[in-house]
Swiss-Prot record:
PROSITE patterns according to UniProt: FGGY_KINASES_1, FGGY_KINASES_2
Database matches in InterPro entries: ATPase_NBD, Carb_kinase_FGGY, Carb_kinase_FGGY_CS, FGGY_C, FGGY_N, Glycerol_kin
Pfam families: FGGY_C (PF02782), FGGY_N (PF00370)
The protein, known as: Glycerol kinase
Taxonomic placement: Bacteria, Bacillati, Mycoplasmatota, Mycoplasmoidales, Metamycoplasmataceae
Keyword set, alphabetical order: ATP-binding, Glycerol metabolism, Kinase, Nucleotide-binding, Transferase
EC assignment: 2.7.1.30
Main function: Key enzyme in the regulation of glycerol uptake and metabolism. Catalyzes the phosphorylation of glycerol to yield sn-glycerol 3-phosphate.
Gene name linked to the record: glpK
Family (UniProt): Belongs to the FGGY kinase family.
Listed GO MF terms: ATP binding; glycerol kinase activity
Length: 507
């Protein structure tokens, strides 16, 4: 059979849904299957997922996308995985059953413990080794919480039966029938346990947090062989031996999917949150502006590539909030339409700090607020201001990056669900004074994992071959007068100032 009749499958395990995609040799997605899964909020600030539900949801999309594409498992040359990062799963290696729900990246239950570590002057200790700042966002304190607060975890640990990992590790373990306990460098670099210089779990950190190395996965390159998918997972008759050869955290995968392979190239993913990454090459750059130094990817035996990252916790999730909680929007896709019904935002600002604020503020005590309300304020103004809040938060990251890089960023490559909003992209170009390029295929997160998997098996020869396949759908240029931009930004900065530390101030 010709090579062009072979395919890559990508599993994209997100925060609210699992998707599986089939990609052909031209880099085209020929089939997608997607299913949402449940979110659990047991207490204020707590966010959990059921790991078995994630696995079953992911598996069902994997099986249905193969059937949708009308291909056999033997037509699939490799499988790539990309996933929500930082979310931690702990399970029994004999039964394969989780000892507790997965604690999600948005969960802030460990805020006070993080405050305690900061008070103990541990900030530099962690930043130097991991490139991260101390924050409940990362896996380390979530894992420590499970080990200390879940009796079943203590019991299994004492018997040497406990395994832990991020979502990629959990999926690899399930896909290989419990044969492989592994993660890739990009996911490991988000745990706050991994030394990004030595590329290994940091023993001093493990000792300090009392986390045994034995429960942690082996860490591999983002593009290399991990293990084979159990044939029976495709169907009872499946014969294909599909290797898992590409693994990356969702944001690093999007950076690769956008082919930001040169130093200084920047992408922003507009998903549940917003994530801006800039490729810094083979050198980790220490941020002076509270951005994260992180591993972008590692291709086989090649040198590790690093990035600077800024994270916005609530972006597309703010539009979901308008739809599900406030009910002033029935369909998230209509936010552009409603925004167009009003000339401007009437100086209304929405600060969607529902789970605190991410970079460059890193304030887990901030709360969301709407400012500038008048008697004449309509739903449309609030919808418009909510869309704009996504651009304002992203702009805060871009400006911090420019300071760290010592240069102006002139081009932003965008992807993710909310990047389909022309109003948001136009506003982003104007507010940040740069060109915005949206690719014809905004599924760059899933494509990144497909490219990583494909390169490892020679499906694509090299990065150059992949670059030729990428097409730009639309270019947005700044269109708002700079004086007006300055006025808008002044209002935004004032609004943010007023929500900082809110919860602590009122307690």
């Amino acid at each position: 059979m010709e090579n062009n009749e072979k395919y890559i499958i990508t599993l994209d395990s997100g925060t609210t849904s699992c998707r599986s995609l089939i990609v052909n040799k031209k880099g085209e997605i020929i089939a997608i299957a997607q299913n949402e899964f449940s979110q659990y909020f047991p207490k204020s600030g707590w966010v959990e997922h059921d790991p078995l539900e994630i696995w079953n949801t992911q598996l069902s999309t994997m099986q249905s996308v193969k059937n949708k594409a009308q291909i056999k498992s033997s037509d699939i040359v490799a499988l790539g995985i990309t996933n929500q990062r930082e979310t931690i799963v702990v399970w029994d290696k004999d039964t394969g059953l989780p000892v507790y729900n997965a604690i999600v990246w948005q969960d802030v239950r460990t805020s006070s413990f993080c405050d305690q570590m900061i008070a103990e002057n541990k900030t530099e200790f962690f930043r130097e080794k991991t490139g991260l700042i101390i924050n409940p966002y990362f896996s380390a304190t979530k894992l420590k919480w499970i080990l200390e607060n879940v009796p079943l975890a203590k019991e299994k640990l004492a018997k040497g039966k406990l395994l832990a990992g991020t979502i990629d590790t959990w999926l690899i373990w399930k896909l290989t029938g419990g044969k492989v306990h592994a993660s890739d460098v990009s996911n490991a670099s988000r745990t706050m346990l991994f030394n990004i210089h030595s590329l290994d779990w940091d023993q001093e950190i493990l000792d300090y947090l009392k986390i045994p190395r034995s429960i942690l996965p082996k860490v591999q390159a983002s593009s290399e062989f991990y293990g084979f998918v159990q044939s029976s997972l495709w169907s009872n008759k499946a014969k294909g031996k599909v290797p898992i050869t590409g693994v990356a955290g969702d944001q690093q995968s999007a950076l690769f999917g956008q082919m930001c392979t040169e130093v200084g190239m920047v992408k922003n993913t507009y998903g549940t949150g917003c994530f801006t990454l800039v490729n810094t090459g083979q050198k980790p750059v220490n941020s002076k502006n509270r951005l994260l130094t992180t591993i972008a990817w590692k291709l086989g035996n090649e040198k590790t590539i690093y990035a600077l990252e800024g994270s916005v916790f609530v972006a597309g999730a703010a539009i979901q909030w308008l739809r599900d909680s406030l009910r002033i929007l029935y369909n998230a896709a209509l936010s552009d339409f409603y925004s167009s019904l009003v000339k401007d935002n009437q100086r209304v600002y929405v600060v969607p700090a529902f789970t605190g604020l991410g970079a460059p503020y890193w304030d887990s005590y901030a709360k969301g607020a709407i400012f500038g309300l008048e008697r004449g304020t309509k739903n449309e103004h609030i919808i418009k201001a909510t869309l704009e809040s996504i651009a304002y938060q992203s702009n805060d990251l871009i400006k911090a990056m420019e300071k760290d890089l010592g240069q102006k960023i002139t081009l932003l490559k965008v992807d993710g669900g909310a990047s389909k909003s022309d109003y948001l992209m136009n506003f982003q170009a104007s507010i940040s004074n740069l060109d915005v390029h949206r690719p014809a295929n905004v599924e760059t997160t899933a494509l990144g994992a497909a490219y990583l998997a494909g390169l490892a098996v020679g499906f694509w020869k090299d990065i150059k071959e992949i670059q030729k396949m990428i097409k730009i759908d639309h270019q947005f240029k700044p269109s708002v007068d700079q004086k007006e931009v300055d006025v808008l930004l002044k209002g935004w900065n004032e609004a943010v100032k007023r929500v900082l530390n809110w919860q602590k101030d009122i307690e």
